[in-house]
């Protein structure tokens, strides 16, 4: 039998709003429901979701709330309806983000419950560190691209070195059959990163003629699809202009005019898209969670297929995460890493979080 402690030292926010910087607090180890896994979390990663939840508590959970929704670790308990996973399986998954995550101090790992359709078995050849940086960003790219990209199409993905962007570029270029994948970045390093991920062309988006360069790459026609995961209203308007007549504009998150949950700004995106008969598609992973959200069978299958694809495509070498930095599971390191994400200072790839001093399983 696996010895499961009653509590652990979680990392998260303890106030309802303005909860950043994060702190540590004792939390009971959660119990899995019928269709859930309890995972001892060995590795995770940082996402903007964590500091936004700490700032805004937009799911309305009563603090203290543990954060850390990317999880890779070992199944130590499971609900009675779970048949696809066994105790001791190495897994990767996404913790329920309207609940609690799995960050913890002390180097002994954290604990998180994961819905079984948001988990996949981790192949032995993939490290817990690599697996632990994938779930949220991979599912965001998968949700934004997989249902919409058709073979041979042209696609523009700004920020192709970012956490979502570098995975989206690989996905579009290497697995979905896009004919032309174009990206952009502000530094030589990040432009090279996007190119290494498979982008056929990468431009400097700060260039005065960036839009002209992008349109020229499509021979003046515009892109079949623009996938914008930047959370920038300025970028939203630019990418909307770049979509061809009748094309698709896919946005990650809450969409134009709502780049944060506390403010609504005027946006011209809908007007721009309507003028050319283009479609506005919202790809928001968080739409599957929160108040009153029920995930139907089709959505569960889609998410499960996405999690399995994250491991399969990694094993095949076609979509692999770029880890820019790895930090230990200390409050100071996590706060520092989240602050760098908040400032969006030319970052690239993912920041991994090691929650255990050893990657050994049971």
Listing of model-derived features with the role each one plays in the protein:
Residues 88, 109, 152, 199, ...:
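Local beta-strand N-terminus motif with an aromatic residue
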Residues 28-45, 55-98, 118:
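Glycine-rich beta-strand-centered segment in the early N-terminal region that forms part
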Residues 94-159:
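NAD(P)H dinucleotide-binding glycine-rich loop of Rossmann-like/cofactor-binding domains
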Residues 111, 134, 157-158, 182-184, ...:
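Glycine- and other small-residue-rich loops at beta-strand/loop junctions that grip anionic moieties
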Residues 149, 202-281:
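Glycine-rich cofactor phosphate-binding loops and adjacent beta1-alpha1 units
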Residues 90, 154, 180, 247-248:
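Short glycine-centered segments of the SAM/dcSAM-binding site in methyltransferase folds
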Residues 134-208, 212-213:
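Mid-domain Rossmann-like dinucleotide-binding core that forms the NAD(H)/NADP(H) cofactor-binding site
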Residues 2-4, 295-362:
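C-terminal hydrophobic helical "lid"/dimerization subdomain
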């Amino acid at each position: 039998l696996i010895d499961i402690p009653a509590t652990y030292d979680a990392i998260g926010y303890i106030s309802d709003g303005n909860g950043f910087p994060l702190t540590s607090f004792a939390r009971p180890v959660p119990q899995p429901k019928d269709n859930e896994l309890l995972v001892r979390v060995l590795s995770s990663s940082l996402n903007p979701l964590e500091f936004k939840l700490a700032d805004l508590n937009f799911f309305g959970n009563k603090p203290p709330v543990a954060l850390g929704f990317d999880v890779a670790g070992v199944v130590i308990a499971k609900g009675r309806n779970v048949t696809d996973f066994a105790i001791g399986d190495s897994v990767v998954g996404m913790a329920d983000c309207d609940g609690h995550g799995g960050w913890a101090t002390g180097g002994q790992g954290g604990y998180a419950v994961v819905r079984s359709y948001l988990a996949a078995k981790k192949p032995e050849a993939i490290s817990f560190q690599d697996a632990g940086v994938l779930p949220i960003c991979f599912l965001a790219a998968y949700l934004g691209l997989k249902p919409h990209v058709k073979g041979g199409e042209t696609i523009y993905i700004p920020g192709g070195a970012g956490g979502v962007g570098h995975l989206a570029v690989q996905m579009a270029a290497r697995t979905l059959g896009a004919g032309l994948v174009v990206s952009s970045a502000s530094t030589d390093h990040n432009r090279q990163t996007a190119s290494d991920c498979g982008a056929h062309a990468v431009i400097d988006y700060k260039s005065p003629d960036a839009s002209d360069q992008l349109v020229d790459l499509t021979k003046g026609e515009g892109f079949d699809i623009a996938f914008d995961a930047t959370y920038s209203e300025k970028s939203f308007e630019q990418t909307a202009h770049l979509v061809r007549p009748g094309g698709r504009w896919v946005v990650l998150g809450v969409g134009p005019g709502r780049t944060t949950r506390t403010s609504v700004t005027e946006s011209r995106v809908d007007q721009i898209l309507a003028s050319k008969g283009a479609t506005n598609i919202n790809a928001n992973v968080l739409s599957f969670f929160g108040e009153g959200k029920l995930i139907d069978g089709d959505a569960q299958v889609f998410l499960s297929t996405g999690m399995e694809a994250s491991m399969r495509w990694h094993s095949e070498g076609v979509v692999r995460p770029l880890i820019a930095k790895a930090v230990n599971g200390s409050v100071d390191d996590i706060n520092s890493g989240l602050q760098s994400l908040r400032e969006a200072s030319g970052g690239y790839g993912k920041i991994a979080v090691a929650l255990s001093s050893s990657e050994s399983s049971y």
